[in-house]
Design a protein with these regions (language model features):
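Conserved RecA-like P-loop NTPase ATPase core
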Residues: 83-86, 99, 137, 177, ...
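N-terminal, positively charged regions that mediate nucleic acid binding
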Residues: 22-31, 36-38, 43-44, 175, ...
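Short, Lys/Arg-enriched N-terminal segments with co-localized hydrophobic residues
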Residues: 1-7
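Phosphate-binding/switch region of NTP-binding enzymes
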Residues: 205-250
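Short, charged low-complexity linear segments at domain edges
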Residues: 8-20
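Detector for small/aliphatic-rich hydrophobic stretches
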Residues: 4, 13, 24-97, 109, ...
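Conserved inter-motif catalytic segment of the P-loop NTP-binding fold
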Residues: 94, 102-105, 113-114, 118-203
Length: 250
């Protein structure tokens, strides 16, 4: 009886997520009913939160399609020809871009080169690293060239702190390296888990759209060459850039 009670208590305090598509289930499943992938469910603990305080709902207006005035889309060039090409001519304000690829293929170096070019155009860029120290970033930057004072660095993984820094500094472009190292205090699971990746991406999407800041997210890949984490990560972003190289090259 005690064993059954403990098992029931565990079920109430944990949930299973599909790492491929983010499908949620109260129990473990061998095959996901949503994406049909096998052995992709992982268990995560959940924490009950206090009921949300009811707020007054304000009236909002609706509009017709013909009444919408289109603004000319302004793009910011990265001055990297091929990157600008795959981005449709440059960076769009308020866009969320996922950059994936094998370890060591050059994701961080390319984005640092992008930061250099943007900062030389007097664009305020915030590079947030959860994997390297400031000294390591500077050593890598010195191999690229001279940077302007428009590039700002931050070593932090707490998303709540990062959100506060972004609101204070108001950068035009943000680099998150990487999404798997970020965590929110609102979620009790470990960094890199399905819940944390989904929460972090959702927060960054709100920042990008609400403040019209372009956000680049670096994502790790699995041994199979797929972006690590739930498929919902790829669905939430505006653009997915994937770097491939010859793994057998010397």
């Amino acid at each position: 009886i005690i064993w059954k009670e403990n098992r029931m208590a565990k079920a109430k305090n944990s949930v299973f997520f599909c790492q491929e598509c983010g499908y949620e289930s109260a129990k473990w499943m061998g095959q996901c009913p949503a994406c049909h992938a096998w052995n992709t469910f992982v268990e995560e603990k959940i924490e009950k939160t206090a009921p949300a305080v009811k707020k007054m709902v304000q009236d909002v207006d609706v509009t017709t399609l013909n009444a919408i005035e289109m603004k000319e889309e302004q793009r910011i060039t990265t001055q990297i020809k091929e990157l600008d090409r795959v981005l449709g001519g440059g960076i769009v304000k308020g866009s969320l871009v996922l950059v994936g690829g094998d370890p060591g293929i050059g994701k961080s170096t390319l984005l640092l080169q992008c930061c250099k070019n943007l900062s030389m155009q007097k664009k305020k860029v915030l590079y947030i690293s959860g994997e390297e120290s400031l000294q390591q970033i500077k050593l890598r930057a010195e191999r690229i060239g001279k940077f302007s004072d428009s590039l700002f660095l931050l070593c932090e993984t707490n998303l709540n702190i990062i959100h506060g820094v972004i609101k204070r500094e108001k950068p035009e472009i943000i680099i998150i390296d990487s999404i798997q190292t970020m965590y929110s205090e609102n979620v009790t699971s470990a960094p890199g888990s399905v819940s944390q990746v989904r929460e972090a991406t959702g927060t960054l999407m709100q920042i990008a759209k609400g403040m019209e800041i372009t956000v680049f997210i670096v994502g790790h890949v699995t041994k199979e060459g797929m972006v690590a984490g739930p498929k919902v990560l790829e669905h939430m972003v505006d653009t997915v850039l994937y770097f491939e190289g010859d793994r057998h090259a010397s």
